[in-house]
UniProtKB/Swiss-Prot annotation:
It catalyses: Endonucleolytic cleavage at apurinic or apyrimidinic sites to products with a 5'-phosphate. The gene is nfi. DNA repair enzyme involved in the repair of deaminated bases. Selectively cleaves double-stranded DNA at the second phosphodiester bond 3' to a deoxyinosine leaving behind the intact lesion on the nicked DNA. Its cofactor is Mg(2+). This is Endonuclease V. One of its GO terms (molecular function) is single-stranded RNA binding. Mg(2+) binds at residues 35, 103.
Length: 223
């Protein structure tokens, strides 16, 4: 595994990330969520992608792709491991979204190329990274109140918003992926909340990927 080459690719790709709002439809009509996991001891990569109507946030389509994992887990290079399965799920969608939420980092990455940015560049779609853990940067401690907010900073640059979406829950790290500004990324995440820790696009993607009860109930009521 030539990490120097991958690192150079990350730096080059990161220079092409668009950090401002460039949505083709604003407001969007369809919003997608994506979640990636691994099965069979990491041998299989599973990507779930869901489509939701906006602003109702009604789930209208889902796809799950499973492919052989193409590279081992290497911290800082996760997007190279995840994007092939994401692309496989993306290509199965009957319609393409106007905005995509990805469970993972956007520019809040040491080389400014988390999976949300990498995939957004790959398919040229506006993306937002919604991560559950910090990868780099620092932020001031948040109060315990829901809605508490702080910038995630690294070397004088804001990489994300750290936002406590729900009481008694760890905060989310909301970042530009591609073609969405940092402030707009947070605003879109906030618009897509329905009382859970995660915004609806990534919550549904996780529910589909893991066959959670919410998804099973949804399947049962479909005509």
């Amino acid at each position: 595994m030539d990490l120097a080459s991958l690192r150079a690719q990350q730096i080059e790709l990161a220079s092409s990330v668009i950090l401002e709002d460039r949505l083709d439809k604003d407001p969007p009509q369809l919003i997608a969520g994506a979640d990636v996991g691994f099965e069979q001891g990491g041998e299989v990569t599973r990507a779930a992608m869901v489509l939701l109507k906006y602003p109702s946030l009604e789930l209208v389509e889902y796809k799950v792709a499973r492919i052989a994992t193409t590279m081992p887990y290497i911290p800082g290079f996760l997007s190279f491991r995840e994007y092939p399965a994401l692309l496989a799920a993306w290509e199965q969608l009957s319609q393409k979204p106007d905005l995509l939420f990805v469970d993972g980092h956007g520019i809040s990455h040491p080389r400014r190329l988390g999976v949300a940015s990498h995939f957004g560049l790959l398919v040229d779609v506006p993306t937002i990274g919604v991560a559950k853990k910090r990868l780099c940067g620092k932020f001031e401690p948040l109060s315990a109140e829901p809605g508490a907010l702080a910038p995630l900073m690294d070397k004088g640059e804001q990489l994300a918003w750290v936002w406590r979406s729900k009481a008694r829950c760890n905060p989310l790290f909301v970042a530009t992926g591609h073609r969405v500004s940092t402030d707009s990324a947070l605003a879109w995440v906030q618009r897509c909340m329905k009382g859970y820790r995660l915004p609806e696009p990534t919550r549904w993607a996780d529910a589909v990927a893991s066959a959670r009860p919410a998804f099973i109930r949804w399947q049962e009521i479909q005509p």
